[in-house]
From Swiss-Prot:
Span of the signal peptide: 1-23
Family per record: Belongs to the somatotropin/prolactin family.
Native species: Oreochromis mossambicus
Protein name per Swiss-Prot or TrEMBL: Prolactin-2
Cell membrane as UniProt keyword: no
Cysteines joined through disulfide linkages: 64-173, 190-200
Length: 200
């Protein structure tokens, strides 16, 4: 009975948080999402720099499991894409990294001992930020219509063995995609604030 009360209390807390978020204006939701994505990209950049994977060969980055998704390649192209489509792209990329981040989290033992602790803690933070950002974008998409709610499936094929080279590749791919997500949300933030395109 006590466990049931606790579960009921947790459910009520979640519902209250969702209700409050749904009452928040779209501009504020976009601003919060942009801040969250900025933190996520900063973490991924820091980790790739620490592990020396920043200069990963571009031809191998093109082999990322998300490469099939057609996305704007620069700010000028992103400015031509609708708000709903930008949000859909950001959500698709974010969803595509749910499983790979789990794989990275469970594979830190293959790295040199000195790097294991740093990688483990940072990936845990990236998972937390990803989940928070996903929850925020889900609420935001519900306010922006069907197009924003569309998610393109980008399957991740997990291999039985994962070594340092595979970890390096995944981290480089995640840094690339987290930069895209951050860029798309910054464009949305600019539009929500009615800023001129040239200053976005």
């Amino acid at each position: 009975m006590r466990q049931r009360r606790i579960s009921g209390s947790n459910l009520m807390m979640v519902l209250c948080v969702v209700a409050m978020c749904r009452a928040v204006p779209i501009n504020d939701l976009i601003y919060r999402a942009s801040q969250q994505s900025d933190k996520l990209h900063a973490l991924s950049s820091m980790l790739t720099q620490e592990l020396g994977s920043e200069a990963f060969p571009i031809d191998r980055v093109l082999a990322c499991h998300t490469s099939s998704l057609q996305t704007p390649t620069d700010k000028e192209q992103a400015l031509q894409v609708s708000e709903s489509d930008l949000l859909s792209l950001a959500r698709s990329l974010l969803q595509a990294w749910s499983d790979p981040l789990e794989v990275l989290s469970s594979s830190t033992n293959v790295l040199p001992y000195s790097a294991q602790s740093t990688l483990s803690k940072t990936i845990q933070k990236m998972q937390e930020h990803s989940k928070d950002l996903k929850d925020g974008l889900d609420i935001l998409s519900s306010k922006m219509g069907p197009a924003a709610q569309t998610i393109t499936s980008l399957p991740f094929i997990e291999t039985n063995e994962i070594g340092q080279d595979k970890i390096t590749k995944l981290l480089s791919c995640f840094r690339r995609d987290s930069h895209k997500i951050d860029s798309f949300l910054k464009v949305l933030r600019c539009r929500a604030a009615n800023m001129q395109p040239q200053v976005c």
